[in-house]
């Protein structure tokens, strides 16, 4: 039996429901399904008149409602539920049908599921979707990975429902296998770094500039009209301006300082460690959330461990602008690192990622959407094989101009005892990256001393070992 729905969505919690509504609102007939049937009934009751929906109560009914090849978006909780749905769907599907996992799956799972589905003649796509609840409904940034021929079957739908910036939809086929979910993972990692940089600026503005939340909210509002213009800077202004109904003071002042996380930042950092890519901005952001969670330990340490207590500066005019520049320079570094990571993963996995296209599809719909991404898109358009974004004249110059302020902020924060892990590690990365000769010569010497790991010389080919504990002579080992 062949149904009439062009595409199906199973999993009607907030993301799946909004994605299904977005698709139907674009005139595409959608079959919907949810494990708990009552949710489907409620969905049809609430939104049934927004488009051409077919509500189904069983997976058999669901697959029967779809055109061939069947195109099925799975929007269930990431992890085991995705495998469960694939297992249940597989016997009901035909050769060439397409399963699209649009949740936040970890990319190695996507690689495995692609192979498992292929063994059953099913085409599997791992698709990153960013933008949260509102993006799913009004236009997300979509990062589809998997078989390009399978993508061709859904391209028109994805392009219709994605956010649009300057007439360009925020969706592009990212690459094969796990590439889509990989890129979504790095997107989320960059989101962690962006947020950490924002909170470090907030901390300094509070404790070193001596400003209160509404005043800082206004500063973020101003910053949002310059180089920093972005969704996260914009909402920072709004969150800081919010008044708590209960206390009459700023809401942010009564929110517990313990950050949650769902794991995508950790995945990004772990992957960077495996690739050997320095990813200090994102990784420090993950560690900072970890430190924030040690609330009880911090409470004890706050009365035990010595250190300066920050005191508000008398003249804050220059300080506020210095903090803005430090935020911008650190942000450039965090993005340079994230893009370097995607480049390394692309080379390792033969994904052939178009990094300029990634910047292009992140300009709208997603959480890190920003003006700044236009600059990154331009950089890759001019230099497709770029090693590091810092080397493009625009960014080289931007960081060069900001660096005096950036260094002042790191010094001031350190003197005043304000933790700035992302600001300071970004500056250290910058200083390390711009050194032709670093100090790792000594590491090699030490490794050779205790483990005969050998070293190379700057003045001769080959590898060498010194008999440190014996006669001290050097021998060539290759
Ligand atoms: P949740 O992640 O909260 O998952 C709830 C859905 O999964 C419900 O439809 C539930 O069905 C279904 N489900 C579960 Br739980 N176990 C199942 C199983 N074994 N078999 C079949 N269905 C099962 O939903 P969400 O917040 O809409 O997110 C969906 C995906 O999108 C996740 O991967 C999430 O990480 C990702 N994502 C979320 C956001 C966001 O802002 N929330 C943003 C971007 C991406 P039930 O109704 O029967 O319990």
Residue ranges and their predicted role:
Residues 1-70, 93-96, 133-136:
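NAD(P)+-binding Rossmann beta1-loop-alpha1 motif at the extreme N-terminus of oxidoreductases
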Residues 7, 64, 82-85, 100, ...:
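Rossmann-fold dinucleotide-binding core
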Residues 30, 55, 124-125, 279, ...:
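Hydrophobic beta-strand scaffold residues
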Residues 35-36, 104-105, 129-130, 417:
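Short, ordered loop/turn segments at secondary-structure junctions
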Residues 54-61, 78-86:
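Glycine-rich, highly charged phosphate/nucleotide-binding loops
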Residues 179, 192-415, 419-420:
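C-terminal substrate-binding/catalytic lobe of Rossmann-fold NAD(P)-dependent dehydrogenases
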Residues 400, 405-478:
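C-terminal amphipathic alpha-helical interaction region
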